[in-house]
Amino acid sequence: HRGEYLYVAEGRGGFRVYDIANIANKSISERIVRAPFSPLGHNAHVGSKQATCFAIGTTQPVHPPKNTRFMQEVNQEQSMHPLFSYAFVTDAEEGLIVVNINTFGDGDPLNNFLERALTWNENGLLDGARFISLYGSFAYIVADQGLITLNIDNPLRPVVTSVIQLAGMRSFATQFRYLFYTSETGLGVVDITDPSQPILVKDSAVALADARKLYLARTYAYVAAGEDGLAIINIEKPEAPVLDQMFDGEGQLKDTSDIVIGTTNASLFGYVADGDFGFKLLQLTSPSSQPNFYGYSPQPKPEVIGWMPSKSRVLS
């Protein structure tokens, strides 16, 4: 999300922006709305054939047009890159859709209308596009052909700088000089020291039967591994990752699709989307389970401490 708005890729429903200004307001009955008033004066939707993912440059409620020359000279602010004005949406059939989202940062409630600024799929390169993340002024996209690198220094004129053929690639996350990806064969590593020319790291694979999404936290990669639960992989040496442990909570994790890591006080927690089996909460470190919990990157000692069923499949 950015500011008071939640951005969503809704598959056949396209790309939509929800108003979540009242998400913590107990006096409001409907806290997530498509429009705070009549949709005749607010249309935060861009239709597409199969929107799969999106990326924005920051979650801060920035408004680049306010970054004027006066602000740069008198207040000594840096100029803002043009990519901060856009949302980059992947669509499995249409490729890349670029949408200007500045309207949600200008403070004017009368002009909240979205439209495409660009639709791009040169020679079908982005057919099957299903995941995107920004790394500086580059966009890394997962598509049927593998990992596609686009230079988006000019967001409305993307330039292909690299294509790495990776069969069955699903998702990825970046940390410093490396990109860790999941595919139908497990976890792999790509060197992105030169962001424009990623290089596949040979002999870096960790075999997993059903690696889905992943999250990186210091020296560990947490990989959602479907019916096998959670794979925790040591990435202290990023070009030689090693499986640390598999965890399914004695059969409680049965359809693990995604995980996000967070810290509360001195304990590490994992928030797990467990597919057909709802939401699961893991405690990864605590004073009782891991005596070294105050260390920089203690070995996780996962345990399921909470869960919530869902009427539909929880994917992320």
Predicted regions and their residues:
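Feature marking well-ordered beta-strand scaffolds used for ligand recognition
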Residues: 1-316
